[in-house]
Amino acid sequence: MKHLDLFSGVGGFSLAASWVWGKDHEVVCFCEQDKFCQKVLNKHWPNVPIVEDVNDVERIVTYTKRLGRWERGNTQTERNTEEVVMARQEPAERTRPDTGTDSAITLLSAGVPCQPASVAGKQSGTRDDRWLWPQTFDVVRAVRPRWCLFENVRGLLSLEGGMVFKSLLSELEAIGYEVWCFVLPACAKNAPHRRDRVWIVAHSKLWEDNGKR
C-alpha cells in the first residue's frame, strides 16, 4: 500500500495508516514545510523524502516514477502532469480522467491548511493565501491515486453559503472520483472535547476493486 502524505504535520495520517495496514504500508513521500515537523518526520521515517512546497508537483510526481509507475509509458499521465504544471487552466479544463489504472499510489492523504475556513479566524476562504485546495487537486490530477482522504474544519461546510464545499466535491467528481463526506467529532474517539472535523473520502472510478470498497 503506497501512501503519499500531503501537509503531513508530524505524520498523524501515516502513523494511523501504518496501524491499519502494518508492514504492507509504505510512505512514498511527505509534503511539509514546517521545520519542526520535518525533524519529527525524519526521526520516524528516516528514508522517506520530504517536499516542502505543494506547488512543486513535478518533484512530488518524481517519487511515483521511482515506483515504476511510468515504466509502461503512460502518456496520458505525462500529459496530465504537463497540463497541471505548465498550462494552469481552469479546473474543469485541466485534464480528463486517465484511461488506465496504473497509479502506484494507493492512498493520498491531506490535512489541507484549515485557517481559511476556521471560525476562529476570518473565514476568508478562497481569498486567503493559505487556501491550498487547488494545489492539492493539482497533485491528485497528476498522481491519480486510487483513494484520497482529506480532513478539515467544520467551517469548510459554510464558506460562501456552502458553495465552496460543493465546488470542491464537484471538482473531484469531474476528474473521475466517487466522493463521500462525513463530519466526525474527536469525542467519537474518546477525546475530551468535541472538535468536529470534515472528512472527505474519494475513490477513483477507474478502480473497480472487484465491486468492493
Regions found by a protein language model. Name each.
Residues 2-58:
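SAM cofactor-binding core of SAM-dependent methyltransferases
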